[in-house]
């Protein structure tokens, strides 16, 4: 179907048929598929270009369909843009509008619906029209025209009026007249007509004719004036004058809205008041104006207000008859009368008040205020309410039969009596859901609950009364009252000198106490001449005094009063440092003087007036040194413990330096925790002074006495418990540590730990033996231990002391040596050469056990042969022990030669004992009776109670190393002893 381009009235339906020669194969395919695409929804259609190619949006799979309905990059949709911004080319702020989000078709559709101002809705009205006309006339004058003369305005600007003007004209308004209410004019006209009718009826015919003529003239005049007013009326809206509100009613309320007759009466009363007011003002005048009178007439309603036009214009002008009427009293005169005088007239006209009355007014005196009355109100607490209301006791009621209910009532009553009424309110709220509490709401058991509540309240009040009496008495108790109660003798006053010196001492002590917390200003007025630090330089002394004033005095500080312009900044800073040092020196000097004065006066007489000494002998106690009262600052060097350095993996900075003895921080520390190093040094010195050939028995006796003199020190240390199973099953390799330092003291805590370790080993053996007997196992008894095996100990304080008591007697080394063999004595001497023997009780225990076993084996021939060489072994052991004391003394002195020899000796001994480490075995020939077991348990308990004094923790590392070496030596001796037994 063809159509012409010029014909706009034709409507085309369908797709036009194109010529085949004008279209390519691809284009024909697109046209053929167009019909199929229309059948698909919009989101399933593929976007293709003009030649039928599918549009590609990106280099990935979803690039063929992008955007809403495939509109990205097309003319119908938005085109993405790259954001570019640099220093030279800044990104522009684009203002967006509704057209930025619309397609071309939408913009075309909205083109005719644009909102624009039109002349039809011109708010200026005729002003805009006149302005347009003037502008057109100006343009016409400037440009030449083919038509001579002015062009009509209708040809230049179309004559249009606004919608407001059209509405006013439809409502009856005419152009050029003001917009006002015409009701006033109609009301005025109606009133004039009413007056004319009234005059016509009252007058004669001649008068009526004249009146008619006059009325016609007046009508003409009124018409002329009306037309004139209409022509020259103002275009402004009238301003309505608001009448002030002078009544007591609400805004907009009209009480006479439905009662017009009352409103008319009120208006007449108001006019009468106004007339009386005007008559009073014009009193004494012969001619009174008639302006207050209004002419009667028809058509005046009750709701209409009087105006100027209501005046009687036909009156004579003067009211002479008003003079004949009595002038009523004014309102001000009536108000001057007393209100009470009006009552004398009575209610009724025939009633008269009597001149004298027999009635007498009876007056009552106010109540008398009691002497103990308190005008301040005190709110009662729940307890006080209970106290006041508990006077009336409820009657006794038997308890309910239900035991659970009785217990519940008694518990609730006790709780309410103790805590207050709010607990009862809580139970009442609970009774709404729980029927068990119905006794609170007049239920079963209510009277029993009231009785129990009263009893508990009385009991609680009786308990509280003694406490209150006691608290009141304790508040008033003073030192004097307490002395009188206890029967103490009153204090005797001391002499006048002591009493006079007491305030001075108190003042000095107060000043010394305040000196630690407050800074006292220095006053240079009372300083002597020799205490002024810069007396040789008066200018500098003046600056120093000014410096002290600025430092210790407040207030405003002026600028530099003393000119110091010649000094540089460095000199000022140096001078200020000098001033600070001088001020500190003066302050210290004053404090020292106060302390010296306090020490001279003493504090012995301060408490003489407050306490009475029990005996006269106590008065001779010397006064204490008061300087020791005040703490002093002390500086000492802190050094970490070696074990601490080892745990933190750092090198001990004080390695090789002697450790100083720590000062006890209190007297209790010095008594209880006595340092062990001092006792050891004393023992070493005493042993070095003594001759070398001193017998071992004598040394043991002296040291046993020394140990007996210090029982408190031994019992004061606390032993650290050692795990039993760890002592049994622990490996010796766990305790291997480096060699101890020669110059470090030994820690007795570690010594006690090692002793506990050995004792726990013995306890473990006994425990396993008893356990085997209970289980019925054949436990082989231990072989008697040869007397040459000793457990190594770490405490070197008692090197040669063996103070173990047995049956009340002291056992010495001489008695033990009688049962030893020569070979065993040599091994004992060799083993004890390097082992410190501080653990005296442990050694004594082992010697006692060895002696007991040796007595049983004296019958053996081998043991008898060994007794022959006991004397030689005694001498060798004594020499070796003396040699050991000398070597230990050299070790403590810290010589380098001794250190090297000790290390060599220990390494040699370690090599010699390494081959004797064998597995532990039990001897089948040991005695295992119950009596020996009980004795051994008793000795172990006694050893467990032993306490060693605690010393400094810096000896920890040395003791750990020493402990490991002692354990190794004891294990070596034990293994060597058992290997000999098996060989036999």
From Swiss-Prot:
Covalent S-S links between cysteines: none
Any one GO molecular function term: primary miRNA binding
InterPro entries reported in the protein's UniProt record: DUF1604 (IPR011666), G_patch_dom (IPR000467), Surp (IPR000061), SWAP/Surp_sf (IPR035967)
Biased composition (Polar residues): 679-695
Keywords: Coiled coil, Growth regulation, mRNA processing, Nucleus, RNA-binding, RNA-mediated gene silencing
Alphabetical list of Pfam families matching this protein: DUF1604, Surp
Region: Disordered, residue numbers: 131-153, 464-503, 679-717, 775-803, 824-984
Domain G-patch per the UniProt entry, residue ranges: 160-202
Top-level taxonomic group: Eukaryota
Skewed-composition ranges (Basic and acidic residues): 131-144, 473-495, 843-858, 947-974
Biological source species: Oryza sativa subsp. indica (Rice)
Coiled coil: 814-859
GO cellular-component term (any): nucleus
Organism taxonomic ancestry: Eukaryota, Viridiplantae, Streptophyta, Embryophyta, Tracheophyta
Basic residues bias locations: 882-892, 905-922, 934-946, 975-984
Annotated function: Functions as a component of microRNA (miRNA) and small interfering RNA (siRNA) biogenesis. May assist Dicer-like (DCL) proteins to efficiently process and/or recruit the precursors of miRNAs and siRNAs.
SURP motif repeats: 408-450
Gene Ontology biological process terms, A to Z: miRNA processing; mRNA processing; phloem or xylem histogenesis; siRNA processing
Compartments reported by the entry: Nucleus
Stated name of the protein: G patch domain-containing protein TGH homolog
Sequence ranges of Low complexity compositional bias: 697-709
């Amino acid at each position: 179907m063809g159509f012409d381009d010029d014909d706009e009235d034709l409507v085309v339906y369908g797709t036009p048929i194109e010529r085949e020669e004008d279209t390519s194969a691809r284009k024909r395919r697109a046209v053929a598929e167009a019909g199929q695409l229309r059948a698909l929804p919009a989101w399933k259609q593929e976007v293709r270009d003009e030649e039928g190619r599918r549009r590609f949006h990106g280099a990935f799979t979803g690039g063929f369909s992008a955007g809403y309905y495939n509109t990205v990059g097309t003319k119908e949709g938005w085109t993405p843009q790259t954001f570019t911004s640099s220093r030279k080319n800044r990104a522009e702020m684009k203002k967006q509008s509704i057209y930025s989000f619309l397609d071309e078709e939408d913009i075309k559709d909205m083109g005719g619906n644009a909102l624009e101002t039109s002349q039809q809705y011109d708010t200026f009205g005729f002003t805009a029209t006149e302005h347009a006309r003037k502008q057109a006339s100006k343009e016409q004058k400037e440009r030449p025209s083919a038509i001579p003369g002015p062009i009509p305005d209708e040809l230049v600007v179309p004559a249009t009026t606004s919608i407001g003007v059209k509405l006013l004209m439809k409502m009856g308004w005419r152009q050029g007249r003001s917009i006002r209410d015409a009701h006033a004019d109609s009301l005025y006209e109606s009133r004039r007509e009413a007056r004319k009718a009234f005059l016509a009826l009252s007058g004669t015919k001649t008068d009526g004719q004249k009146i008619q003529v006059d009325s016609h003239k007046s009508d003409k005049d009124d018409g002329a004036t009306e037309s004139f007013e209409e022509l020259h009326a103002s275009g402004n809206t009238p301003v309505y004058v608001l009448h002030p509100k002078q009544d007591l009613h609400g805004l907009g309320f009209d009480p006479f809205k439905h009662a017009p007759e009352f409103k008319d009466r009120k208006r007449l009363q108001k006019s009468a008041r106004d007339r009386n007011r005007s008559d009073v003002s014009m009193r004494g005048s012969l001619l009174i104006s008639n302006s207050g009178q209004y002419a009667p007439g028809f058509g005046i309603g009750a709701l209409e207000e009087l105006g100027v036009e209501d005046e009687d214009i036909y009156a004579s002008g003067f009211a002479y008859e008003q003079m004949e009427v009595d002038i009523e009293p004014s309102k001000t005169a009536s108000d001057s009368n007393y209100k009470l005088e009006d009552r004398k007239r009575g209610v009724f006209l025939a009633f008269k008040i009597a001149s004298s009355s027999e009635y007498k007014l009876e007056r009552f005196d106010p109540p008398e205020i009691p002497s103990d009355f308190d005008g301040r109100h005190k709110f009662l607490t729940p307890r006080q309410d209970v106290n006041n209301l508990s006077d009336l006791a409820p009657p006794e009621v038997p308890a309910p039969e239900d035991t659970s209910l009785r217990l519940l009532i008694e518990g609730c009553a006790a709780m309410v009596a103790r805590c207050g009424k709010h607990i009862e309110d809580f139970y009442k709220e609970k009774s709404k859901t729980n029927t068990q509490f119905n006794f609170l709401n007049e239920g079963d058991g209510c009277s029993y609950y009231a009785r129990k509540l009263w009893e508990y309240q009385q009991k609680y009040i009786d308990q509280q009364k003694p406490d209150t009496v006691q608290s009141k008495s304790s508040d008033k108790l003073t030192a004097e009252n307490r002395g009188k109660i206890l029967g103490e003798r009153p204090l005797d006053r001391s002499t006048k000198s002591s009493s006079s010196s007491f305030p001075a001492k108190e003042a000095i002590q107060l000043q010394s106490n305040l000196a630690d917390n407050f800074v006292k200003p220095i006053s240079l007025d009372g300083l002597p001449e020799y205490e002024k630090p810069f007396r040789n330089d008066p200018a500098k002394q003046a600056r120093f005094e000014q410096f002290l004033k600025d430092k210790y005095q407040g207030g405003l500080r002026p600028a530099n009063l003393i000119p110091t312009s010649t000094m540089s900044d460095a000199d000022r800073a140096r001078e200020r440092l000098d001033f600070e040092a001088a001020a500190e020196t003066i302050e210290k000097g004053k404090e020292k003087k106060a302390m010296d004065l306090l020490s001279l006066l003493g504090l012995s007489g301060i408490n003489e007036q407050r306490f009475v000494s029990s005996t006269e002998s106590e008065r001779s106690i010397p006064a204490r040194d008061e300087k020791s009262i005040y703490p002093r600052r002390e500086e000492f060097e802190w050094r970490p413990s070696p074990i601490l350095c080892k745990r933190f993996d750092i090198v001990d900075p004080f390695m090789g330096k002697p450790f100083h003895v720590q000062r006890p921080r209190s007297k209790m520390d010095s008594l209880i925790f006595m340092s062990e190093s001092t006792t050891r040094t004393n023992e070493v010195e005493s042993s070095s002074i003594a001759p070398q050939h001193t017998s071992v028995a004598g040394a043991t006796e002296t040291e046993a006495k020394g140990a007996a003199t210090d029982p408190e020190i031994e019992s004061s240390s606390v032993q650290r418990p050692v795990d039993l199973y760890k002592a049994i099953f622990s490996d010796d390799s766990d305790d291997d540590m480096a060699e101890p330092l020669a110059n470090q003291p030994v820690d007795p805590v570690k010594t006690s730990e090692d002793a506990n370790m050995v004792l726990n080993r013995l306890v473990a053996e006994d425990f396993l033996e008893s356990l085997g007997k209970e289980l019925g196992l054949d436990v082989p008894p231990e072989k008697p231990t040869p007397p040459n095996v000793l457990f190594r100990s770490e405490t070197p304080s008692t090197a040669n002391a063996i103070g173990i008591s047995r049956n009340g007697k002291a056992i010495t080394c001489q008695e033990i040596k009688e049962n030893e063999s020569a070979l065993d004595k040599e091994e004992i001497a060799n083993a004890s050469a390097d082992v410190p023997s501080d653990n005296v009780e442990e050694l004594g225990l082992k010697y006692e056990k060895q002696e007991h076993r040796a007595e049983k084996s004296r019958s053996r021939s081998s043991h008898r042969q060994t007794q022959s060489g006991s004397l030689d072994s005694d001498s060798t052991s004594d020499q070796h022990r003396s040699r050991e004391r000398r070597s230990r003394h050299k070790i403590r002195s810290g010589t380098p030669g001794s250190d090297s020899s000790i290390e060599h000796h220990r390494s040699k001994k370690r090599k010699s004992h390494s081959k004797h480490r064998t597995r532990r075995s039990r001897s089948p020939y040991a005695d295992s009776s119950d009596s020996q077991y009980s004795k051994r348990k008793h000795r172990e308990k006694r050893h467990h109670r032993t306490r060693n004094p605690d010393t400094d923790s810096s000896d920890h590392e040395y003791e750990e190393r020493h402990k490991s070496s002692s354990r190794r030596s004891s294990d070596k001796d034990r293994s060597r002893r058992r290997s000999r037994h098996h060989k036999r």
